[in-house]
Regions:
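Bacterial Sec-dependent N-terminal signal peptides
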Residues: 1-26, 287
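Subset of outer-membrane beta-barrel
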Residues: 22-369
């Protein structure tokens, strides 16, 4: 009886909390950038094939492939001519039974030196540039992952994984948010093909925002007709990612792997290939050619959208745009270095980004092969 009463109380509190919250289509967008140059070079088509420490981001079920020794992954990228800086790091640790794997991941996206022009205009209407101060806006995510195999049937192996994530967002000294959420994933692996399913923000991820504004700043907001922010809660709706890959063994040394993913969102119409009020579907396609599992060449395409044609002077014609990506990688003993080259759109003025990542298998000297 006490347990039933506890669950009822918990549900009531959750419903009450959600009633004051707002679902946003593009909440926590920094968590959609990606992890590792391999995944970015394949246009983020990773949910089925990922099998290293970056699986904590793409699909935690893939962490089961990290065996015998811990694995470290690091990545750095800069966007918009260096204005935005994105860093990712993860550590995958096989547990003593060599079946379950623990993953720890950290993501950070930040923009520094943002001008704060709140006090630019003096009370008499004059402009005082010396009143401009700068601040930084930074988003952090901490992912705690656990994965293990759950079933073997014939030639297929099934593994599952979960993420618990803590989110911290900060805009100078003015605004701070804390949030948490959960992800869950499954991988089915065969000799030539794999299937992956990832439920992101499966229980709905929320951010609780609080604001710290001085009285002088509130006064400026009031007299300039700006809303004075108050505490609020922001919700991120669940997303389902499904995908599959197939390996073409071209000869003894050369393999070609192709993967297709579908991102399914349920928060209303989006600018995607399939768009409806019930579900929107965003496809991603990736390829990876590998030679002796030492040298890799990759490519992919994603982010299909309808946008105004840059060459149309009437500003009415729409065309399909997309985001291509290419990359390469090579392995040297227990170290893997990957590179990706992406652009944010294929219009006349694309914004290109170079991404590098490093993977190190922390093998003990006595275990080196």
């Amino acid at each position: 009886m006490k347990r039933t009463r506890f669950y009822v109380t918990l549900v009531v509190l959750m419903v009450q909390q959600f009633s004051y919250a707002q679902f946003r289509k593009y909440s926590n967008e920094f968590l959609n950038i990606g992890a590792g140059a391999r995944g970015l070079a394949m246009a983020s088509a990773q949910v089925a094939s990922v099998s290293d420490g970056t699986a904590g981001y793409w699909n935690p079920a893939g962490l089961v492939n990290v065996k015998d020794a811990p694995q470290l992954n690091l990545m750095h990228a800069e966007y918009f001519a260096g204005i935005g800086k994105y860093d990712y790091g993860s550590l995958a640790i096989p547990l003593k039974d060599n079946k379950r794997v623990l993953g720890l991941s950290l993501l950070r996206f930040a923009v520094d030196d943002i001008p704060n022009t709140v006090f630019l205009v003096e009370a008499d209407g004059s402009i005082n540039f010396s009143n401009i101060k700068t601040f930084s806006s930074a988003d952090y995510a901490f992912l705690f992952s656990l994965a293990q195999p759950i079933k073997t049937t014939g030639k297929s192996k099934i593994s599952a994984g979960v993420n618990a994530k803590i989110i911290h967002r900060k805009a100078g000294d003015m605004a701070t948010a804390w949030g948490f959420g959960f992800d869950a994933g499954v991988q089915i692996v065969n000799n030539k093909w794999k299937i992956g399913i990832m439920a992101r923000d499966v229980t709905t991820t929320f951010n609780a925002w609080s604001y710290s504004l001085s009285e002088k700043m509130r006064e400026v907001f009031y007299y300039t007709g700006n809303d004075i922010p108050s505490k609020s809660t922001e919700l991120t709706a669940p997303k389902l990612i499904v995908g599959g890959d197939y390996i073409f063994r071209l000869n003894k040394n050369l393999n070609l792997m192709a993967e297709a993913n579908l991102d399914l969102t349920f928060d209303g119409r989006r600018n995607t290939v399939i768009s409806s009020s019930v579900v929107s579907v965003d496809p991603k396609l990736g390829l990876e050619a590998s030679w002796k599992n030492v040298f890799f060449v990759r490519g992919g395409i994603n982010n299909f959208q309808r946008a105004l044609d840059d060459n149309d002077i009437t500003n009415t014609k729409k065309v399909w745009i997309y985001q291509p990506a290419v990359g390469a990688g090579f392995r040297l003993s227990n170290v893997l270095i990957d590179y990706a080259f992406t652009n944010l759109a294929n219009q006349s003025n694309p914004l290109y980004t170079h991404v590098f990542s490093l993977r190190v298998d922390l093998v003990k000297k006595g275990n080196k092969k």
